[in-house]
Amino acid sequence: MAKADLDKDPFDVASMFDDVGKNYDLTNTVLSFGQDRVWRKRTRQRLDLKPGEKVLDLAAGTAVSTVELAKSGAFCVACDFSQGMLAAGKDRDVSKVVGDGMQLPFADNSFDAVTISYGLRNIHDFRAGLKEMARVTKPGGRLTVAEFSTPVIPVFGTVYKEYLMRLLPQAARAVSSNPEAYIYLADSIRAWPSQAELAREINQNGWSDCGWQNLTFGIVALHSAIKPEN
């Protein structure tokens, strides 16, 4: 896929994920060698949720991430642009809402915290998406972004790039109902900002005090920030 193809129409992206919903969770576990479960747990811990807080899980997909967040005792809402993905998680006992990350169907200052896992890349204008997440978060509320990032060990980074370019697309063709979604994944990861670059973008688009924690040598980074009080 050419780099220009990453500028997909939002409805094309939603349709692509509609097609992979049924086997999405299993495919992710296989392709991440089981690390996806660890990353979900660390995201919950990083967000530091309290019982009774109201939390938005944006780009929640099949709501497997929302169920993990709900272990904290917080009230969690799964929101995704793909109806097919949400339908694939219909048996997961959390609230589910279809919504566009650039026009969220929630009032201002609705949530104590918001998180988005591996979906910020898929928002057509991710900067507008960051501002929209800030809009629906209460002043002083928290953001955690879990996203694929830049490995911090050079030798490992070389191996990882080889995996993205060659092995991941081949593996996706073997286990996924729509391999194109994972080819898009590999290309969009390579085009994504580094940890420091993303932190700057977050601080410039509705949030402050952004820092990050690397997971699995930087394959994934958890960026956390606060919505200013004023």
Swiss-Prot record:
Pathway: Quinol/quinone metabolism; menaquinone biosynthesis; menaquinol from 1,4-dihydroxy-2-naphthoate: step 2/2. One of its GO terms (molecular function) is demethylmenaquinone methyltransferase activity. Its EC number is 2.1.1.163. It catalyses: a 2-demethylmenaquinol + S-adenosyl-L-methionine = a menaquinol + S-adenosyl-L-homocysteine + H(+). The keyword Lyase does not apply. The keyword rRNA processing does not apply. Keywords: Menaquinone biosynthesis, Methyltransferase, S-adenosyl-L-methionine, Transferase. Pfam families: Ubie_methyltran (PF01209). It is an enzyme of class 2 (transferase). InterPro entries: SAM-dependent_MTases_sf, UbiE/COQ5_MeTrFase, UbiE/COQ5_MeTrFase_CS. GO terms for biological process: menaquinone biosynthetic process; methylation. S-adenosyl-L-methionine binds at T62, D80, D100, G101, S117. It comes from the Bacteria. Belongs to the class I-like SAM-binding methyltransferase superfamily. MenG/UbiE family. PANTHER family: 2-METHOXY-6-POLYPRENYL-1,4-BENZOQUINOL METHYLASE, MITOCHONDRIAL, METHYLTRANSFERASE. Methyltransferase required for the conversion of demethylmenaquinol (DMKH2) to menaquinol (MKH2). HAMAP family: MenG_UbiE_methyltr. This is Demethylmenaquinone methyltransferase. The gene is menG.
